[in-house]
Amino acid sequence: MIEFHDVHKTYRVAGREIPALQPTRLNIQAGQIFGLIGHSGAGKSTLLRLINRLEEPSGGRILVEGEDVTALDAEGLRRFRQRVGMIFQHFNLLSSKTVADNIAMPLRLAGGFSRAEVDARVSELLARVGLSDHARKYPAQLSGGQKQRVGIARALACRPSILLCDEATSALDPQTTASVLQLLAEINRELKLTIVLITHEMDVIRRVCDQVAVMDGGAIVEQGDVADVFLHPQHPTTRRFVFEAERVDEDERHDDFAHVPGLILRLTFRGEATYAPLLGTVARQTGVDYSILSGRIDRIKDTPYGQLTLALVGGDLEAAMSQLNAADVHVEVLR
């Protein structure tokens, strides 16, 4: 578990104090993929780098697996960082070293490994990230996705229990992003690693994360299960991220329905309810007619969900609303 107890960070610039992270309390459970999302300057990179003390906190306590990281001396911090891997937006590979040598670097710096042990570990990691045929290549000979896979392999070299991902997919095209996210999900599942990633894309959170914290102005403004936050956003910042991910402007969508008669609802289905023939049943039993104005079915990690915007007219509208609410469907009245 990673715990933040009133952790905050302030920079001093030209005699002025600039807060980067407001006092923050946060719990990240072991084995989760935890996402931090926010626009530039929201404080997410600062928070991530506080975990392994690449940034020093101005106050508060950080506990990782029960150990007070803020109290570690230089030697204790060095040993602790061997348990925390990190991957970066721009890969940070050594251009003069081969793929194999880049992956081996943390093992050689840590010491205590024979050449045979290093070579065996590098071969194992190359196979895990799908680059067994690229050991003798140099970074300049690789695609962006391949470079990031090398970065992931290097981060795993010392068998960490935590993996920090600093905008690991923002420099990649959509197809490569999907493959890297799939690799991270496999690593989390098979190695039981705790992964903390930061991003400015809600789609990245939706694909792989279990929990999410939304950041704005150096503070966590919303936090919870990804499905709950994605499907029922409360804070304006979260709502903007969700509607950007859906490529829908909320105000324009409401304007599109101005001419539509009846009660306009947005229904959100989750899990098995996504595929249930609910609307037909409600219409038959209550005598209402409905028009589907928009709809989509997608997945949040492994959970299917559906969203429908529809207009109800005629019949017993109150009974229809009651049946929808009773069916474990989230109902939002738009008009």
From Swiss-Prot:
ATP binds at residues 38-45. One of its GO terms (molecular function) is ATP hydrolysis activity. One of its GO terms (cellular component) is plasma membrane. PROSITE patterns: ABC_TRANSPORTER_1 (PS00211), ABC_TRANSPORTER_2 (PS50893), METN (PS51264). Its main location: membrane. Its EC number is 7.4.2.11. Keywords: Amino-acid transport, ATP-binding, Cell inner membrane, Cell membrane, Membrane, Nucleotide-binding, Translocase, Transport. It is found in: Cell inner membrane. CDD domains: ABC_MetN_methionine_transporter. Residues 2-242 form the ABC transporter domain. It catalyses: L-methionine(out) + ATP + H2O = L-methionine(in) + ADP + phosphate + H(+); D-methionine(out) + ATP + H2O = D-methionine(in) + ADP + phosphate + H(+). The keyword Glycosyltransferase does not apply. It is a peripheral membrane protein. It comes from the Bacteria. SMART domains: AAA, NIL. The complex is composed of two ATP-binding proteins (MetN), two transmembrane proteins (MetI) and a solute-binding protein (MetQ). Belongs to the ABC transporter superfamily. Methionine importer (TC 3.A.1.24) family. Part of the ABC transporter complex MetNIQ involved in methionine import. Responsible for energy coupling to the transport system. This is Methionine import ATP-binding protein MetN 2. It comes from Pseudomonas aeruginosa (strain ATCC 15692 / DSM 22644 / CIP 104116 / JCM 14847 / LMG 12228 / 1C / PRS 101 / PAO1).
